[in-house]
Amino acid sequence: MKTLILLIQFFTRIPLPIQINMDEINLKKGSALLPLVGVVIGAWNWLVFSLVALVMPLPVAIIAGLFAEIIITGGFHVDALADTADGLFSSRKKERMLEIMKDSRVGANGVIAICFYFLFYGALFLSVPNIQQIGWLFFVLPIVAKGVTMLLFAKMSYAGSKEGLGSIFLGVPWWPIMIAQGIVLIVLALFFSYIGLIAYAGVLVFTIIYRLFVYKRIGGMNGDTLGAGGQMGQLVCLFCLVLIWGLM
């Protein structure tokens, strides 16, 4: 329970007034619970979307659901997406890319990435067959994001500062990663049957390609690329689901 509370405090802005000594917690092994943080975020997103959908048009409810995640996470990983875009697409050397990612200012690539991310997200949500499935997706996608993050932990080389937040998860064993994947697959199967599993196969392909690209550019992961990977992974999952539904 302490591990889950610490993970919620780490990845969300939920004000849990509980002091936990990190020396007592093995976050590397406890990272198996990371998808449960996605459950908390997803439940909040679903609740906000569902309540707004009762009184407002669907596009407004979708925007509210997307904004709900920013509220509960503090835009933690959206900021990571912007920093990653600024750094990796700066056409600079590795050291300079890492410096750009540390810069608190958002550059042109970061702004473009965020704009297209949310535009694409909204367009895909509007392409989902029915409103019930949209609600399910608001719940499930943050869980998928945490599953992708866990995959990126596998045999991770760390390119950032050893004091960086992502370095906490350097050396995560295989078994927490596999447990996390099992949780994600069960959730997808429960809500979307075999279609969800096929969509996650697409997410796995994306994760491999993304990992190879990042390692080629900066030689490993850092906190920004880990966060961005999760955000893009859930978008890829949504894209795959919409694509499969469109082909059926």
Swiss-Prot record:
| EC id | 2.7.8.26
Q: Where are the transmembrane segments?
A: 24-44, 47-67, 70-90, 106-126, 134-154, 159-179, 193-215, 228-248
Q: Name one GO biological process term.
A: cobalamin biosynthetic process
Name any cofactors this protein relies on: Mg(2+)
One Gene Ontology cellular component term attached to this UniProt record is: plasma membrane
User: What catalytic activity does the UniProt entry give for this protein?
Assistant: alpha-ribazole + adenosylcob(III)inamide-GDP = adenosylcob(III)alamin + GMP + H(+); alpha-ribazole 5'-phosphate + adenosylcob(III)inamide-GDP = adenosylcob(III)alamin 5'-phosphate + GMP + H(+)
Q: Which UniProt keywords apply?
A: Cell membrane, Cobalamin biosynthesis, Magnesium, Membrane, Transferase, Transmembrane, Transmembrane helix
Matching HAMAP family: CobS
Regarding protein family, the annotation reads: Belongs to the CobS family.
Q: What is this protein called in UniProt?
A: Adenosylcobinamide-GDP ribazoletransferase
- Which species? Listeria innocua serovar 6a (strain ATCC BAA-680 / CLIP 11262)
Q: What is the lineage of its organism?
A: Bacteria, Bacillati, Bacillota, Bacilli, Bacillales
